[in-house]
C-alpha cells in the first residue's frame, strides 16, 4: 500500500520492498511461481478494506490477546493509547469510515492489514470438495516478519508455529466446561455421552468451514469479518453481539464458580455490613469482583495473558487430581449410573455444547499461523485432546459420585484430601487471570462507541469496565446456578457460534460453488444446531425459573 503516513492518518504505509523480500514459499506443492507474479501485480492495487472500518474494529486485537501469549508490558488506562478506539460510530452508521478528527492520533489500522494477504488471489476456494487442497493465506508466512503493535499495545504476531497454535486452541477450549462434564453425564446418562462426540465432530467440521470462508477473500481475518462478507453490516453486528454476549456470560460463570468453590472451602464465612448479612456465597462473590476489578483496569493485559496460558496446565492438573482421588484414594460410590435420562437430557445438550465454544478464536489462530496449511491438523489435535479429556472426566466423575454429582465436580471432592485442596485452589486461581482477558473484548467494543470528544478521558473507559464487572456480579448473584447457566450459554450462544453461523456463512459466501453434498451437510448441521439450541435453551430457562420461584 503506497500510502504516506501522517499524524492524522488512519492507515500506515506498508513496507512493500521488505514484504517482497520476506515473501517466501513454505508450501512448495501448494503454490507455483505464478503466485509471486500475482503478488507483484496486485501490490499497486492494495487498498484499505471496508472490514477495518465497521464496528467492532477492536475485535482482532482483543481476541488475539485473549487467546495467545504476547510480549509482556503493563500499564493502566490513563495512557493515551487506551483512547484510540473511541469514536462516534453511530453518527453516520456503523460502517462510516473514520475521519482524522475522530481518530486524531491513530497511525495504524485498527485491524492490522498485511500486504501479502491483500495480494492473495481471489480464487482460493475450491469447488471440488470441502476438504480439497486450497492455496493458503500468505500474510503470515514471512519468515522474518516483525510483531507489529497496535492500539492497547497488543502484539499482532503472524508467525505462530504449529505448537503455538495448538496451545492457543487448547487454552480456549480447555476451560471451566470440563468441571461440568460429570454433571452432564448425570443429566443425560451414559448414552448421552454420544452427544459430546457428535458435537466434537461437527464443531471440528465447522471450524474447517471458517477457514474456507476466510480464504474466499484476502482481507477477511476475524469472525465478524466473515459475518459481514456473508450478510453485510447487519451480519457483522449480529455475529459480534453474539460473540460478546458469550464472553460476557463466561465472566458471569467465573463469578459463580469462585463463589461456589470458595464457599465450599469456608462455609461459615459471613460478613455484616450496615445491617446487611452476607453469607459465604454472597461474600466470596463480592470479594472476587473486587479482586478482579483492578486487573480489568489494566491497559495492557499481556502479563495476565502469559499467566492465563497456564490454563491448559491448570485443567490437566485438576483432571489428574480427580483421577488420583478416584483411583488411588478410592473415593466415591462407584455408581453404575443411568443409561439414558430423557427428562434432563436437554440440559446435557447445552453443557456438552459449551465444551466446544472456541470458534470465536479460530479465525484469529488461522490468520496468525506461519503455515496456514497446518490449520486442519491444529484443529484435529485440539478437538481430539479436549474431547478425550472431557469424556474421561465425565466417565470418572459420574462413576465416582453417581446421582449426587454436582454442577462442578470439585464440589463433590472430600475436603480433607490434599489432592482436593490442589484441585479446588487451582480452580479458584485460574479465573482470576482469565476474567480480565475475557471481559476486555466486550469493554473495548463499547469504548469504540464513546463520542470522539470524550475519547481522551480515560475515566470513561474505567467507568465502562467497572460497570461491566459489577453487572456480572449482579447477574451471578441473581442466577447462581453454575450448571444451568452453562447449559443456557451452550444452547443459546455456543450453538449459534459453533454449529449454525459457520455453515450459514459458508453457504452465503460460496453460493453457487457449493456442491450438493456440501449443501446437504451444511443444512444438516444448521438443523442439528437449531434444534439443539431451542430444546436446550428452553430446558435451561425453565429450570432456572423453577429454581428461582422455589
Curated annotation (Swiss-Prot):
Organism encoding this protein: Arabidopsis thaliana
Entry keyword Transmembrane helix: yes
Predominant location category: membrane
Identification of the protein by name: Amino acid transporter AVT1C
N-terminal signal peptide: none
Keywords assigned by UniProt, alphabetized: Amino-acid transport, Membrane, Transmembrane, Transmembrane helix, Transport
Location of the protein in the cell: Membrane
Biased amino acid composition, Polar residues: 1-11
Amino acid at each position: 500500500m503506497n500510502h504516506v503516513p501522517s499524524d492524522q492518518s488512519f492507515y500506515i504505509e506498508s513496507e512493500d520492498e521488505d514484504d517482497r523480500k520476506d515473501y517466501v514459499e513454505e508450501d512448495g506443492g501448494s503454490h507455483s511461481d505464478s503466485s509471486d507474479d500475482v503478488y507483484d501485480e496486485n501490490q499497486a492495487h492494495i487498498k484499505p478494506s471496508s472490514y477495518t472500518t465497521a464496528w467492532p474494529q477492536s475485535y482482532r486485537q482483543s481476541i488475539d490477546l485473549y487467546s495467545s501469549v504476547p510480549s509482556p508490558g503493563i500499564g493502566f488506562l490513563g495512557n493515551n493509547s487506551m483512547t484510540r478506539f473511541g469514536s462516534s460510530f453511530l453518527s453516520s452508521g456503523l460502517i462510516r469510515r473514520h475521519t482524522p478528527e475522530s481518530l486524531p492520533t491513530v497511525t495504524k489500522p485498527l485491524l492490522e492489514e498485511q500486504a501479502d494477504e491483500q495480494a492473495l488471489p481471489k480464487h482460493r476456494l475450491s469447488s471440488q470438495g470441502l476438504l480439497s487442497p486450497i492455496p493458503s493465506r500468505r500474510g503470515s508466512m514471512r519468515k522474518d516478519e516483525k510483531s507489529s503493535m497496535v492500539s492497547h499495545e497488543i502484539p499482532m504476531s503472524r508467525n505462530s508455529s504449529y505448537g503455538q497454535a495448538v496451545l492457543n486452541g487448547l487454552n480456549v477450549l480447555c476451560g471451566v466446561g470440563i468441571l461440568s462434564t460429570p454433571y452432564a453425564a448425570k443429566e443425560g446418562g451414559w448414552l448421552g455421552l454420544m452427544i459430546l462426540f457428535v458435537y466434537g465432530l461437527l464443531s471440528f467440521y465447522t471450524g474447517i468451514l471458517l477457514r474456507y470462508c476466510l480464504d474466499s477473500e484476502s482481507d477477511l481475518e476475524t469472525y465478524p469479518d466473515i459475518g459481514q462478507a456473508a450478510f453485510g453490516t447487519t451480519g457483522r453486528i449480529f455475529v459480534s453481539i453474539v460473540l460478546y454476549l458469550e464472553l460476557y456470560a463466561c465472566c458471569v460463570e467465573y463469578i459463580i464458580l469462585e463463589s461456589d468453590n470458595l464457599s465450599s472451602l469456608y462455609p461459615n464465612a459471613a460478613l455484616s455490613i450496615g445491617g446487611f448479612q452476607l453469607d459465604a456465597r454472597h461474600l466470596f462473590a463480592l470479594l472476587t469482583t473486587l479482586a478482579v476489578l483492578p486487573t480489568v483496569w489494566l491497559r495492557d493485559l499481556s502479563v495476565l495473558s502469559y499467566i492465563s496460558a497456564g490454563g491448559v496446565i491448570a485443567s490437566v492438573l485438576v483432571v489428574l487430581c480427580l483421577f488420583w482421588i478416584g483411583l488411588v484414594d478410592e473415593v466415591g460410590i462407584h455408581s453404575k449410573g443411568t443409561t439414558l435420562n430423557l427428562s434432563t437430557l436437554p440440559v446435557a445438550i447445552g453443557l456438552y455444547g459449551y465444551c466446544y465454544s472456541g470458534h470465536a478464536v479460530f479465525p484469529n489462530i488461522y490468520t496468525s499461523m506461519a503455515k496456514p496449511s497446518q490449520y486442519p491438523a491444529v484443529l484435529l489435535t485440539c478437538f481430539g485432546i479436549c474431547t478425550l479429556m472431557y469424556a474421561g472426566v465425565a466417565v470418572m466423575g459420574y462413576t465416582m459420585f453417581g446421582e449426587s454429582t454436582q454442577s462442578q465436580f470439585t464440589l463433590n471432592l472430600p475436603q480433607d484430601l490434599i489432592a482436593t485442596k490442589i484441585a479446588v485452589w487451582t480452580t479458584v486461581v485460574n479465573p482470576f487471570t482469565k476474567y480480565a482477558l475475557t471481559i476486555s473484548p466486550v469493554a473495548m467494543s463499547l469504548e469504540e462507541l464513546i463520542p470522539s470528544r470524550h475519547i481522551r478521558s480515560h475515566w470513561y473507559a474505567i467507568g465502562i469496565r467497572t460497570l461491566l464487572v459489577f453487572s456480572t456480579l449482579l447477574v451471578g448473584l441473581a442466577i447462581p446456578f453454575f450448571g444451568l447457566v452453562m447449559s443456557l450459554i451452550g444452547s443459546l450462544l455456543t450453538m449459534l457460534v459453533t454449529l449454525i453461523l459457520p455453515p450459514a456463512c459458508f453457504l452465503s459466501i460460496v453460493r453457487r460453488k457449493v456442491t450438493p453434498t456440501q449443501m446437504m451437510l451444511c443444512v444438516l448441521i444448521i438443523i442439528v444446531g437449531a434444534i439443539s439450541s431451542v430444546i436446550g435453551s428452553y430446558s435451561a430457562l425453565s429450570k432456572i425459573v423453577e429454581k428461582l420461584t422455589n
